[in-house]
Design a protein with these regions (language model features):
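Short S/T/G/P-rich N-terminal loop/turn motif that feeds into the first structured element of a domain
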Residues: 1-77, 81-96
Length: 96
């Protein structure tokens, strides 16, 4: 049985509207990209700063998730979405 990892990933983007559009449900969406490896995401943004964004991700396989982020598809998605990669932070759920 695979243990699901819950992660909070937050980052700044150049244009929150562009980032949000990439996450709209439908063909080619970021939801579809992550669903290929079984990841489900929920989207968030700061109501006073739409360029401060994030996702909560349910990740069944962290190695596959990291591979996707580093793949050509993942890097292209970040570039197209205007993600400021240097601002990206990820917290994973743990039990102390």
């Amino acid at each position: 049985m695979t243990t699901m990892t819950t992660a909070i990933i937050f980052h700044e983007v150049r244009d929150g509207a562009v980032w949000a559009k990439a996450w709209q449900q439908g063909p080619g969406s970021r939801h579809e990209l992550f669903a290929r490896i079984g990841v489900k995401c929920r989207n968030f943004r700061d109501p006073s700063d739409p360029n401060s964004t994030g996702v909560v991700a349910e990740i069944p396989d962290m190695a596959k998730f990291q591979e996707l982020l580093e793949s050509d598809d993942g890097l292209r998605a970040m570039r197209e979405d205007g993600l400021k990669v240097e601002t990206m932070r990820m917290l994973v759920e743990f039990t102390p």
